[in-house]
Amino acid sequence: MSHTAEIPLVPGSESPLELKPLKAADPQAVYHRRAHRLLSLAKDSPLADYFELCRRLVSIQAKLAEEADFGQLLAWGKDEATPLSLLGSEADSYWQGLLQQLLSDLLPQVDESIARVMRLLMQQSPEQLSSWGRSLRQGHVSEVPAHFSLFIWAAMGVYWSHWAPMVIKRMDQRKVAQQSMCPVCGCHPVASVIVDQPRAGLRYLHCSLCESEWHYIRAHCTSCGQDKEMTIWSLDDAQAQVRIESCDECHGYTKMMFVENSPSMDVAADDLATLMLDSELNAKGFGATTLNPLLMAHETT
C-alpha cells in the first residue's frame, strides 16, 4: 500500500502530438520487459551467466514493484528541482527493507560465491547502507564496494521508480529544462532512446534509477550541451539499432537506442549487450557519461 503527498496536479496538454518534456515509466512493465530482453540477449552472449544473474535480479524487482510496501511519499514543493533527490533518512528505511527482500529472494538462485557476497551485504548496518546508497545516487560509484553496488542500486531503483510517476504528475513540466541529469531524481541516464511517439525521431534520456525519460535535443552533447563537433559511431552500418554519439569537446559519449525500430529493446540490457562499442570508444579516448544499473562501473579519475 502506498500513499502520495497531497499536492495539486499540474494541468497538461491534451494534444497527442505535444512534445512531453518528461515521461513516466510503469516500473512493473519496465522490469518485465528488461527480464525478457536479458533472456533473449543471453543466448548469443559470452556473458550469458551474468545476463542470467541480472535476469533473476530484475524479475525480483518486478515482483517487489507489484507487492512491496513503499510507505508514504515525503512532501515536497512542486517548484523544487529534482524532487526525488531530496529524499533522506525516511526513504532509507524503505529501500533498505526492499534490499533485504530482494537478497532473500535471490539468495537461493545463485551460486555460493555470489551468495557469500549477498550474505555479507545483508549484515551491513543501516548507517553504512545509507552512506553507500547516497554515494551511488550522487555518482560516486567508486566509494562503494563493487560487489555490492548492483544489489544496492536494484533496491533503490524499485523504490525511486515507484514514486517517480506520481511525482511527475505534480511537476510543472513547463519548467523542465534540457539537462544531463534526471529532472526527477538527479541521477545519470543509462542511454538515449529514439522513439516514434508522440512524434518520430524524438530523443529521450532514460534514467538509471527512477526509469523516467526526459527530452533532449538530438545532435547535442548530453553532457556538455555543445552541438558543433559530434560524431556518430556504430559497429556495422549507419542504420544500426545501437549507435554511439561522441563529443569532441568534452570527450564524453552516450549510446542511442533506436527503439522506434525495435520495440523489444531495453536500455540497460542492450547497453550491456554492446560493451564492445564502449571498448572501441574508450580506446579512442572517449568516456561514457552514463550509468548502467546492471553494470556499476567505477568512475575514472
Curated annotation (Swiss-Prot):
SUPFAM superfamilies xref list: FdhE-like
GO cellular component, as recorded: cytosol
Molecular function via GO: ferric iron binding
Gene Ontology BP annotations: protein maturation
Localization, UniProt: Cytoplasm
CDD domains: FdhE
Job of this protein: Necessary for formate dehydrogenase activity.
NCBIfam families: FdhE
Family named by the database record: Belongs to the FdhE family.
Protein name, UniProt field: Protein FdhE homolog
Gene: fdhE
